[in-house]
Amino acid sequence: PRRGRESGPAGPLPYAEPMTDRRLAVQAWESLFRAQHEVFDDIRTDFDGTELTQAEYDVLLTVTRAPRMTARLREVTGNMLISQPSVSRLVERMVARGLVTKCADPEDGRGSLVTATEEGAVIFRRIAASHARSIAERMARLSDAELAQLHALTAKLRDDA
């Protein structure tokens, strides 16, 4: 783990002393896990009655953020909370529904490229606007400074700060 001055979205983080209290570490982890679980359950309802499942939304989130709305299948899989075979089956169902296309990756003979169709992108944007409002409502209890700190801390835990 890195120590010292690190930076987050709000600038440098103060010097991080090594963790010494294992009980506090476990309590913090359990609290983070419970918060994530509760928020995830709440957010899941954002997709009730929409044209996309949460998993389909997650695929389109990765794909629409990529250049030319095209991402490698392994990038999509890396952003999902399900296994690679499950992602592959999900993408195949999305192809059948006309939400994405899938083709061989010319730069990687074993890989595939996933591209959002116009229909998939339109549906994604419509749901994304509502989903973003829902997330903002859930996060409104935190100040901008707390949100920046939360972002920095979770990035640090993911080791990509």
Predicted regions: what is each one?
Residues 1-50, 97-99:
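N-terminal leader segment of winged-helix/HTH proteins
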Residues 21-24, 52-54, 116, 142:
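Alpha-helical hairpin
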Residues 33, 61-68, 128, 155:
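Short, locally clustered residues in the helix-turn-helix/winged-helix DNA-binding domain
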Residues 40, 92-155:
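Charged, amphipathic alpha-helical coiled-coil/dimerization segments
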Residues 41-83:
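N-terminal helix-turn-helix DNA-binding core of bacterial DNA-binding proteins
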Residues 159-160:
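Short, charged, intrinsically disordered terminal tails
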